[in-house]
């Protein structure tokens, strides 16, 4: 099986005003607030045609600043396949990355920063991967939040 980075999966926005942001995506764009994994931080997922395309993270109760290098857009995500191959590629190139499994889900992720500091999230459906074990390692602190 080869390596492929597919279509845009979703984008993530860190906000200090979750309610107004949810309202905008519902009222203005017509998205629907829907199910979200039980992450350790508050937020909301907004759906289009049954797909969570906008992830919102509430940072209003933290001292966490909005990243100046990416503004309110935190990362860009792509549906992908070839999890092990991508990890090998990143390691061969000497690139720091973070891999993890979504809590309670069948989704594996790799996070890596582009040369401009934009975080790229690569999502892999575990059932479609030919690897024996779920991701557990952490390479540097690229992180999703």
Task: Walk through the language-model features, giving the residues of each.
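Vicinal oxygen chelate
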Residues: 1-4, 7-16, 44-47, 65-145, ...
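Short beta-strand
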Residues: 35-38, 74, 100-102
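A short, acidic/glycine-rich surface segment
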Residues: 41-42, 61-66, 130-132
